[in-house]
């Protein structure tokens, strides 16, 4: 079997396929080349049977039908070293060994021992049984995954069911038990989707490589198969843990008007937290926010001092919101509060864990707006956002510290 391909075209395929390449001394560390009739060649890789990719190599000339393998790390290194503007020949003998050469230079030949391609994980069966669930723009999926990622738990020992984001009932959601986020879009209707935190980087790389395309989502009970319009296929296993049911009132919090609402410049808020934390115990993450309803001054943030002799206090300037600039969330939260009737107990003083707040802020622009409400003895900070480019509404919630 023989493959003749331009260096840039082989490199483009390997750049995607190497995202699911393993490092063990077995087939998981090899690329598998599949040659079919009519110059149809794909390159596959699968890490620990959990991740899979299949990428067309095109344009290409091929001879023979069958499969051969090449150690992935060495092949990528060789292709990068050969550089653009050259043509690469790969030829497999009847023992599976592969010779790589640069066309026009007969002395430049590299030999690689191959493995049995039949030991490659059986993703073909999973793919053939998968049913098409939905086709979504890659940019929409990318925006949603980047927005939800800070809320996915990374503690897979105590709460593995929370180490994933899911789409169900028209909403994407995630929680680490202390904060949560929900994204709502008509595009999510009738879609059942689960992605584990450890798969976010590879899925996002796949989406980035196909950012102008629509992505088909095919599903089985065990896996999701993403198919791009150029024929590239990416597979990953679904978590077998059931995501917990979120309280119904949180799922319907998009229309809430919190009891109190504040707007800040993101830099001002983060700088205040950084300053306070520099003078507190390294294991202390609790900040007290204080701004009574009748206050004529800016809100204050307070932390216990490292010396425990006094408290550290920092004032955070409020941002002035012009109604003409607040027609969309998050700034619209301020106007909604001003136009709504005030009722209930004031929520102007509470304690929060700044680690969770900083995770939320990592996904926001320079305008930070949040409201607070209280239910019995429990309170929470509520954030709203809107992705107009994709018609997506988002709410996120950070629990107060009791």
Name every feature range the model reports, one short phrase each.
Residues 1-402:
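Structural preference for solvent-exposed beta-strand-turn elements
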């Amino acid at each position: 079997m023989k493959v003749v391909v331009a260096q840039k075209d082989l490199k483009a395929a390997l750049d995607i396929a190497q995202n699911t390449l393993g490092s063990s001394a077995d087939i998981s560390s090899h690329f598998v080349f599949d040659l079919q009739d009519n110059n149809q060649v794909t390159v596959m890789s699968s890490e620990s049977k959990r991740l899979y990719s299949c990428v067309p190599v095109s344009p290409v000339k091929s001879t023979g039908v069958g499969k051969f393998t090449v150690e992935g790390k060495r092949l990528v290194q060789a292709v990068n070293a050969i550089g653009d503007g050259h043509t690469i020949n790969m030829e497999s003998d009847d023992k599976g060994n592969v010779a790589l050469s640069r066309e026009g230079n007969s002395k430049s030949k590299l030999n690689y021992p191959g493995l049995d391609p039949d030991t490659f994980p059986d993703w073909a069966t999973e793919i053939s049984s998968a049913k098409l669930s939905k086709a979504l723009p890659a940019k929409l999926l990318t925006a949603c995954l980047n927005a939800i990622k800070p809320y996915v738990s990374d503690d897979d020992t105590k709460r593995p069911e929370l180490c994933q984001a899911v789409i169900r009932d028209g909403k994407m959601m995630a929680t680490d038990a202390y904060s949560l986020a929900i994204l709502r879009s008509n595009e999510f209707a009738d879609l059942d989707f689960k992605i584990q935190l450890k798969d976010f980087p590879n899925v996002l790389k796949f989406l980035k490589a196909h950012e102008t395309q629509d992505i088909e989502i095919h599903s089985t009970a065990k896996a999701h198969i993403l198919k791009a319009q150029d024929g590239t296929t990416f597979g990953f296993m679904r978590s077998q843990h059931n995501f917990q049911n979120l309280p119904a009132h949180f799922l319907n919090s998009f229309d809430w008007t919190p009891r109190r609402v504040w707007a800040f410049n993101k830099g001002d808020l983060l700088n205040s937290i950084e300053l306070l934390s520099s003078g507190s115990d390294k294991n202390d993450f609790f900040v007290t926010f204080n701004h009574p309803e009748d206050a004529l001054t800016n809100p204050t943030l307070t932390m216990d001092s490292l010396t425990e002799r006094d408290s550290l206090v920092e004032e955070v300037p409020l941002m002035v919101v012009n109604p003409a600039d607040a027609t969309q969330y998050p700034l619209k939260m301020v106007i909604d509060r001003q136009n709504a009737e005030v009722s209930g107990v004031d929520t102007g003083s509470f304690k929060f864990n700044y680690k969770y707040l900083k995770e939320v802020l990592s996904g926001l622009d320079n305008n930070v707006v949040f409201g607070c409400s209280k239910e019995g003895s429990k309170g929470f900070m509520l954030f709203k956002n809107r992705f107009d480019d994709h018609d997506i509404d988002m709410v996120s919630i950070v629990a107060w510290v009791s």
